[in-house]
Amino acid sequence: MCGIVGIVGNQPVSERLVEALKRLEYRGYDSAGVATIDAGTLQRRRAEGKLVNLESRLREEPLAGTIGIAHTRWATHGAPTERNAHPHFTEGVAVVHNGIIENFAELKDELAAGGAEFQTETDTEVVAHLLTKYRRDGLGRREAMHAMLKRVKGAYALAVLFEDDPSTIMAARNGPPLAIGHGSGEMFLGSDAIALAPFTNEITYLIDGDWAVIGKTGVHIFDFDGNVVERPRQISTAAAFLVDKGNHRHFMEKEIYEQPEVIAHALGHYVNFIENRVVPISDAIDFGKVPSLAISACGTAYLAGLIGKYWFERYARLPVEIDVASEFRYREIPLSPQSAALFISQSGETADTLASLRYCKEHGLKIGAVVNARESTIARESDAVFPILAGPEIGVASTKAFTCQLAVLAALAVGAGKARGTISGEEEQALVKSLAEMPRIMGQVLNSIQPKIESLSRELSKCHDVLYLGRGTSFPLAMEGALKLKEISYIHAEGYAAGELKHGPIALIDENMPVIVIAPHDRFFDKTVSNMQEVAARGGRIILITDEKGAAASKLDTMHTIVLPEVDEIIAPMIFSLPLQLLAYHTAVFMGTDVDQPRNLAKSVTVE
């Protein structure tokens, strides 16, 4: 969600702060700002909208100073205006914040009664006023920081400047991530290591409850009680990452076309392509012995988990309990300490998923993390980490991370089946051989379907509602297709199990309703054809995504039929996701929306 950066050193910082913010644009934001201390005075520039607006403001009114903090805001409390943009100032204090202060209304009333005058609608401003109050009460800077942290409740990552200390940034973490970067004669602060990659690859991650005093030559870290603590310094792999679209119009387009390569890379970590066997990955979770598996995630990662559920239950005969992370821990699920749980998150920082992970840890379950960021909080708090190895994904709408999550879950399910004795050695080899073929087939599909997709997308861009249908693993895929379309084109779309058509959605069908049916010629195909006939009988405009055999067998008039290669069931979700991604992408391009940073969305949702 929001992005935080800070630099303290001997060189001017404002331009470098903005460059660091650009590396956090993928998180989503609606306003931005920078504050520095120059000649003993706090100064700031803020702007609504994209970073180009802030850059324009800085060209008109440059900021000097060798210490500064900066922020991209994703609105939670208060409208996305310049007035509500961070940094927030009170007397002698500048604050940037990612998160939600849950008791801000109570604190605001208390501070206002004491004479504080609030200038914004944000929850963050109470932090600045608390710090000013404690300084007026005679507390030193560190004492004021510690006292403030004792008062605020909720999730926060904070960076603070005190006007009377032009050589120190203070920071705190409780929930959203914060990374401290170590330089030579300068230090850095960022919401993640990607922001700091141009400056340093030596990173220290704060953990929940930590707060830090960062100077030019080092950092002092304290726990919530004020005790000095040590946190390990590590080398980040984010340093190799460059924000570059290459020859593509958008990051999303680039990431769609990267999928054959990144999936081949990911699978190489989990299977032996020569012997067509799965590779043992972790001793921490024994899939051969666990009686059941829980899966929790949000958004697209949750839909990947739903598909994974089919695989674990079919190939490993392993019962799976799955729910969206925001609901998971409130259901009071009876959990067995002998069971295991998988948590799926691209960023590894998703707040609801992390909370569900901690809920399962409290109940004694073994924890596995299916993440893209191996240095993330979810990864660090898990017993086993299953990296998806997708590389940085900048587009807010997930594409390559989704298919890499599926590839990893498929490999884990086959490995679990082998460990449980529910698939034979020959079946294991056949399944792994199918997985090994997947990158080649994905490349073939991406090179062949674009013209048809573009033509169809032009028509879809004129629609107001779209229905997606599927059975088996194509049902979660239908939900994913609908999610992609609504995320980036802002067209209302819903994904349903095809068998549920008669239980409500059929009431929406008329000659204006496109119905996208995902129907490989599998064991569900005949039933899905029956559903298509019901749509056709009511004048619905059918868009069929199937394979050669399905196209020949359907015998239905369709608005469009997209024909894909015939593939094994275990790789069908990854192959059939490609036209869904391209359909959403090109429709959004025709609609003229901000494809990579769609309105109101954030890449990494770090608050509940």
From Swiss-Prot:
One of its GO terms (biological process) is fructose 6-phosphate metabolic process. One of its GO terms (cellular component) is cytosol. Pfam families: GATase_6, SIS. Residues 2-217 form the Glutamine amidotransferase type-2 domain. InterPro entries: GATase_2_dom (IPR017932), GFAT (IPR005855), GFAT_N (IPR047084), GlmS/AgaS_SIS (IPR035466), GlmS/FrlB_SIS (IPR035490), Ntn_hydrolases_N (IPR029055), SIS_dom (IPR001347), SIS_dom_sf (IPR046348). Keywords: Aminotransferase, Cytoplasm, Glutamine amidotransferase, Nodulation, Plasmid, Repeat, Transferase. It is an enzyme of class 2 (transferase). The active site is at C2, K603. One of its GO terms (molecular function) is glutamine-fructose-6-phosphate transaminase (isomerizing) activity. It is found in: Cytoplasm. Its EC number is 2.6.1.16. Residues 281-422, 456-598 form the SIS domain. Gene3D superfamilies: Glucose-6-phosphate isomerase like protein, domain 1, Glutamine Phosphoribosylpyrophosphate, subunit 1, domain 1. It catalyses: D-fructose 6-phosphate + L-glutamine = D-glucosamine 6-phosphate + L-glutamate. The keyword Cytoplasm applies. HAMAP family: GlmS. Involved in the production of the root hair deformation (HAD) factor specifically on medicago. This is Glutamine--fructose-6-phosphate aminotransferase [isomerizing]. It comes from Rhizobium meliloti (strain 1021).
